[in-house]
Curated annotation (Swiss-Prot):
Record-given protein name: Diaminopimelate epimerase
Family membership noted in the UniProt record: Belongs to the diaminopimelate epimerase family.
Coiled coil (residue ranges): none
Keyword Cytoplasm: yes
Active site positions, chain numbering: 73, 216
């Protein structure tokens, strides 16, 4: 009944990697609530590793702290790759997700790189409630936030570009309102971005199902695409987050490559039915 897990983070994005390859039961809502409410195990996302069903090495399920499922989590995917590499399962991986195959690797410098695939830029490929002709400029407003750019990288993101210091914007006030806007029947990730040069921007994110987060890898990818679409940056930029930097390359073939560090906090065993756990002794 006990399942191996590791508490990790990607630039402060709190991740639990759970090894369910041999588990009899999947994670229950009770277990998710118990882990999310415990200060030691509180997380933004659970990355559950399962045997694959397609041409992949492993299948990944992603759970938010509120019990909802996510379709993509860039930092969580990087943590999974680090976990797999640390368990001597290789350095290059193909991971099956609900939106397709994601490829990633641990580089020789120790950083983790993930190919997030191509973004969806057409409104017909996005869960929105009304017709949108130009997703590069969408009329949605909350306080000083207006003129959003919508980008989907498996999950939907609304990016608002701000000329002033984004630290002065109360995202905890506007994020929930925009996340639940009627335009987004499946809710939305909300980010504010400040361009600092042609090669960098600063980002803060209100994450769907998790709230204000220190880092969101898919938001970093979406913001880089949005900035390039508007002619604000080059294809290869640094995205500055509260806890560090993610390197984002929006290639000519439109694949998004995200590279950055991960951190292991502790490992242990947990019960996927109840969420009770025990740390490993070092």
């Amino acid at each position: 009944m006990k399942t191996p897990f590791s508490k990790m983070n990607g630039l402060g994005n709190k991740i639990i990697v759970a090894d369910l390859r041999k588990a009899i039961h999947n994670i229950t809502p009770q277990a998710i609530q118990a882990l999310a409410s415990n200060p030691q195990t509180h997380f933004d996302q659970i990355m559950a590793i399962h045997p694959p069903t397609q041409d992949a090495d492993f299948r990944i399920e992603i759970w938010n702290a509120d019990g909802s499922m996510a379709k993509a989590c860039g930092n969580g995917t990087r943590c999974v790759i680090e976990w797999l590499a640390n368990h001597n399962l290789g350095n290059n991986f193909r991971l099956e997700t609900s939106t397709g195959i994601v490829e990633g690797k641990r580089q020789t410098d120790g950083l983790i790189s993930v190919d997030m695939g191509r973004p969806y830029l057409n409104a017909k490929d996005m869960p929105v409630s009304r017709e949108i002709i130009d997703t590069n400029h969408v009329d949605i407003t909350a306080g000083p936030l207006q003129d959003a750019c919508l980008v989907s990288v498996g999950n939907l993101h609304a990016i608002f570009f701000i000329e002033s210091n984004i630290q002065n914007i109360p995202l905890e006030k506007y994020g929930p309102k925009l996340e639940h806007d009627p335009l987004f029947p499946e809710r939305c990730n909300i980010s504010i971005a400040q361009i600092t040069s042609k090669k960098s921007l600063t980002l803060r994110t209100w994450e769907r199902g998790a709230g204000l987060t220190q880092a969101c890898g898919s938001a970093a990818c979406a913001s880089a695409v949005a900035a390039y679409r508007r002619g604000l940056t080059e294809r290869h930029i640094d995205v500055n987050l509260p806890k560090g930097i993610l390197s984002i390359l929006y290639r000519d073939d439109e694949h998004i490559i995200m590279t950055g560090p991960t951190e292991h906090e502790f490992s242990g065993l947990f019960n996927p039915l109840t969420g009770t756990y025990k740390k490993d002794h070092l």
